Amino acid sequence: MEKLSVITPVFNGARFIEKLIDSISELKIPYEHIIVDGGSNDNTLKIIKKYKSFIKKIISEKDVGIYDAMNKGIKKSNNDIIVFCNSGDFFYKN
């Protein structure tokens, strides 16, 4: 079965990132979650690190925008199927 890579570019997403990570952790298919934080100055990184057991790779460094962050995530992906899920998004159950 092919695996899914979920890439989350985020900057100052502390308000919603926890809900996103919770929803992804409940997926019933094989996946890897890669989060690319663009150097947030709120609590985003602190929240992400609480969930590190559900996240394959955390990248935290300045970037030059969302597309730079997305490309960084793609380079770290090991799968054929890639989806992007922004910090304010989440998956519904079922």
What function would you assign to each model-found segment?
Residues 15-18, 42-50:
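Acidic helix N-cap motif at the loop->helix transition within catalytic regions
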Residues 60-77:
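Glycine-rich, basic loop-to-helix element that forms the pyrophosphate-binding segment
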